[in-house]
Amino acid sequence: MTAKEEEKQERFQLLMTQIGLQDVTTYEEFTKDAKIEKLVADKKNKTWQFHLHVPQIFPAALFHMMDVGMKRAFSQIAETEMQIVPENQTINETLIQDYWNLIVEPIGKQSPMIGKLLMEQKPTFKEPHFIEVAVHNDMEEATIQQRFQTKIIESYGKAGFPRLAMKMHMLDQSETDEYKAFAQAKQEEDQKKAAEAVQVMQKRQAEGQSGGGGAAPLTGPFQIGYKIKDDEEVKRLGDIYDEERRITVQGLIFATEIRELRSGRSLLQFKITDYTSSMIIKMFSRDNEDAAMFQNLKKGMWVKVRGSVQNDTFVRDLIMMAQDVNEIAGVKRLDTAEEKRAELHLHSPMSQMDATSSVDSLFKQAADWGHKAIAITDHSVAQSFPEAYGAGQKYGLKVIFGIEANLIDDGVPIAYNDQHIALEDATYCVFDVETTGLSAVYDTIIELAGVKMKNGEIIDKFEAFIDPGHPLSATTINLTGITDDMVKGSDPIDVVLKRFKEWSGDDILVAHNASFDMGFINTAYEKVGLEKAENAVVDTLELARFLYPHFKNHRLNTLTKKFNIILEQHHRAVFDAEATAYLAWKLIKDAKEMHNIDFHDSLNDYMGEGDAYKRARPFHATIYAQTAVGLKNLFKLITMSNINYFYRVPRIPRSQLKKLREGLIIGTACSQGELFEAMMQKGMQAAEKVAEFYDFIEVQPKPVYAPLIERELVRDEKALEEILKNIVRVGEKTGKPVVATGNVHYKDPVDKIYRKILIHSQGGANPLNRAELPDVHFRTTDEMLKEFAFLGEEKAKEIVVTNANLVVDWMENLKPIKDELYTPKIDGAEDEVRNMSYAMAHQLYGEKLPEIVEARLEKELKSIIGHGFAVIYLISHKLVKKSLVDGYLVGSRGSVGSSFVATMTEITEVNPLPPHYLCPNCKDSEFFDDGSVGSGFDLPDKDCPHCGTAYQKEGQDIPFETFLGFKGDKVPDIDLNFSGDYQPVAHAYTKEIFGEDYVFRAGTIGTVAEKTAFGYVRNYERDMNMTIRGAEIDRLVAGCTGVKRTTGQHPGGIIVIPDYMDVYDFTPVQFPADATDSEWKTTHFDFHSIHDNVLKLDILGHDDPTAIRMLQDLSGIDPKTIPTDDPDVMKLFGSTESLGVKPADIDSKTGTLGIPEFGTRFVRQMLEQTKPTTFSELVQISGLSHGTDVWLGNAEELIKNKTCELPDVIGCRDDIMVFLIYQGLESSLAFKIMESVRKGKGLTDEMEEAMMANKVPLWYIESCKKIKYMFPKAHAAAYVLMAVRIAYFKVHYPLYFYATYFTVRADDFDLTSMVNGKEAVKATMKEVNDKGMEASTKEKNLLTVLEIANEMLARGFHFQKVDLYKSSADEFIIDGESLIPPFNAIPSLGTNVAKQIVAARENGEFLSKEDLQQRGKVSKTIIQYMDDQGCLEGLPDQNQLSLF
């Protein structure tokens, strides 16, 4: 064998070692003579193809092991594949079938159907080289031939097989049946094997014991099947690549599910992880006892599982069919130290996209370890404070509330060593240094160059290399272009510095980023025994930032390019110095011209003004609230950083921190803090000066600083230890306690992957992506002591334990949220609400109020006034009143309609009294309080027996308790639906009422959702060139969800701060999503956190009031006069008769398309089944459709089985209380039952007994048990009232209805179909319907619009084309029996452009399409669309100039 051939064999053996298969002796006969013939590398596509020369085709298992091993080993470098070239190409059916699953498995990802077909069979082999597979039909055959046949043949070819041909065999009926039987048998066999594998745990307990439905009580660790021996080999999940028989794995359960099968058995499915990967485990129950035992398997358990790994065609992944499952002791880190530390630097998921472990899990861990306290220090925010306080109470921990702030100096100096030197006459020594690193203390200068400039001309030069005495690092060489050869043998640094100091003399020193260059020069001067430079200094970087703040950046190469200054070789001192000199002269002239700066000591006159905070470089500092005053000051600082000093991140100027320092403790934070940086770059003296500002000094474990070493900002671990030792010495010298903190971002080391995925999702925008992330898990006392062992045992304990607890003891116990509700005060609010209520009651019910009216008023007013809620009613009244005066109705949401006082103060139109007649003339009334009538609107028409006037009909029979609770002390939540058009006006009105400093939008916190996290994980998998099992993806997704991603504002929530307090008593303030141009500020805390402490007004935007206003404008009809029992309107909810069309015409058996709450397919089906004829029944429908488990599987079955009728079923939560009181239950118990049922808690035994004792039907009791959530009746009644009014117009004024619907509710149109008539609309509807689930959201929305359009066309109306001179910008216009669409109905034409067209039209006719495009600001695409639709007939393409 030649040397070259031997080398090829050695390369192959090296490859086997690299991929971890060097010890695979089973396949030695296949690998011993194997060679790497060549490696084809495609740099562009990052692929490597290994051409392997082998004696014969590898067994499938060996090929697979090598393929997986190569992909793992080279995942960070390239995508790998093999091309096997065997000397012997002999093949047989067994070999082909062995490879089959490997080759066809990827097809399942592209086509699950074809993948399943191929995976469930084995090909047959026909000589010479044919393989044959079975298909059921032509479609399957065509799909395989067109999409997958070539891939299959090529895959076999890459494995070394000779060129194969592929045939398809169509199964006849008998074969199809046989195939189905085979597939069924295979499935049954799998299930049978799994069931048989669940061996007897022990002899079942004594006879007669129920195997029932409940979880069997555990008397010890969970076990199903046999005990798994402690010494049995456990395989890592990450090492499982293929099907395997009878292996054992172990891990943490992170998801469980039990499914009941049609066979009566249960399927247990759970997911485990050992943090190398994750896997789905399945197990079938053998009997009821197994099924009961399944319920004892819980998320969070550690288990050992024995079973077989197999491909699951349903999940298309490897899963394990379990035979034995044993609970085992989990892997836990323990804190065994006698004296415990306390963590003072910890991040929660509120540190935006940067920390992953929940507050609860971190606090539980601290408590389990025996720590007495813990601090929260999220990045610039306090949003975890409320949750942290609750967790502290739960686990008995003292909570220290802090933030990790971005601290800035108030303006960075442009000039140092100020001197009164005329800038135009001065001589400048412009210099630059190239160094081995960023630390003036630990690194050294390797090139020093400068030029002297006078009057803009270079008059002298200085240039010198310096021998550092050691080889240069690759980073230094790459960055500077300076090599070892260039510096070797050069003068030592003391010689060069002495020459430079003499050369520069007293001239003004100039550098770009002078603090760096001067830091190196002065530190170097000190090292060699020279005096520090006292020269006047100018920093061109800060001068450029001051003069040109709008530039994107102010790097030297950017500025020289901007000003056409030659920079020949950036990062070489001589070239940088020369370019900086010309730049400096340009800047000096601009400073004179722009700001009249003539002298060196005037350069800093503007420091800190205007946007100077944007130019300052932030550094980290930890700020803690020590006292209640400090907590308020912290809230003020957070607000200030978000409102006044936000630039990329919230910033806190040092001067503001000094002003508000009372009650605060300040720590030095992490490697991004100024103390660590000063020590790293400038040395002990600078660090001591910095330390004076702080209360204590932080140091962190060496692994936390690891990225500094990786990026060569710190030379090595020894240099890092030296920095940390020096920081400890600074603490000793200054008397500041030094505390070891963890900079915690997650709980356990295995959680690091979640943070990696989150940081990776942010791309290059996040500086953390520039190096491997450090290990920043929550460390025990033992672990922390070990990290600082290099300081000596005594000193390590001092900083880890003693000083940490010392700082804890400085802090008071604080509460970041209030205990009570603080409502605004309006003088006389109580009297005003009482007087208004009685005045309206007397106006409606007469001078002598009916007893039922007065009793209800007094009951409510006692609660409302007694608990301080009158002001809330008064505010709501003012808001509604203003809207009504301005011409917009207001709909109510939630339970406010349960309050009669709310009705009397005109907050809601819903009257909650029992159904009654009311005479508008003589005020006579007649009440029905026995439950015989569901709604006053359903009473038959009747005249007043006293004066003959037609009675008004009112009352929805809703108890007050559903609004303010049984004791009337629940904080009222008044939700109001304003017109979407009017909502901004209503919001602004709150500022008029309370003042701008006392109203804020309710803040929200947007976290990473599961779908978003899935995208992050998939992108990470792709970019890291990994293949991650499905169960592992699920685990990673779960670990990334819930992390703060952004902030926002509640769509209608307004928080009102009482004027006798200020907002900082409750929460900091910020802009939503950091949008500093936002009109509104929001609460910093999520509004749920302070919901019970301050008044929240829900001023929501809704389409119904907008639609009602448009209908009123079109018709002139006051919506309040519309009858609620119009017969033709009521028919609409059960048939299409009122519309004059047949059900087939509109594909609906009811006429409620487009009616709010009743137009969806789901509710229309309910209407078809229930056929409501009254208002109260419509309220029932509304309640049933909004509840959970109220209709489906509950009321629906009761009505279908004729157990009861629609009026009898439970529709709304209030129905329960009212019905039970009518049945004779005591009112407080009726209330408790209603509350329990509506919250999905079902009934207690005592409740059931009381209901049965009062003859409540059994079906009613069972119905209550099924319910998970219920809708308030007042909400339903308000919705139905609006719906009936809109339905009135649909029946009696159809074009008004359709014009309003398309204007207010529709966003997506197909004008081509709509204009072309009914058949065109139906054809488009069919296209969308045919897509089924594959239809896009836009297409589904369009379908709804087309259903309404189809109905309008069926009723004999039609659509015109968009008319250049008639169309509105944004409203459909009625023209005879047709509608003219607005301009914004044209695809991609927005409302602003539509308004621009109308404005241009008012200034004169359009001369041409070109004129329309220019004056109307219309794109060419829109012009083309309008032209194609015939909207621009007669309009020439371009303006024409006439000569006559």
Curated annotation (Swiss-Prot):
Q: What is this protein called?
A: DNA polymerase III PolC-type
What is the native source organism of this protein? Listeria monocytogenes serovar 1/2a (strain ATCC BAA-679 / EGD-e)
User: Biological process GO terms, please?
Assistant: DNA-templated DNA replication
Disulphide bridges in this chain? Answer: none
Q: Which Pfam families does this one have?
A: DNA_pol3_a_NI, DNA_pol3_a_NII, DNA_pol3_alpha, DNA_pol3_finger, HHH_6, PHP, RNase_T, tRNA_anti-codon
Q: Which gene encodes it?
A: polC
Q: Which InterPro entries match?
A: DNA_pol3_alpha_NTPase_dom, DNA_pol3_finger, DNA_PolC-like_N_II, DNA_PolC-type_N_I, DnaE2/DnaE/PolC, DNAPol_HHH, DnaQ, Exonuclease_RNaseT/DNA_pol3
| Protein's job | Required for replicative DNA synthesis. This DNA polymerase also exhibits 3' to 5' exonuclease activity.
Keyword entries, A-Z: Cytoplasm, DNA replication, DNA-directed DNA polymerase, Exonuclease, Hydrolase, Nuclease, Nucleotidyltransferase, Transferase
Q: Ranges for the Exonuclease domain?
A: 428-584
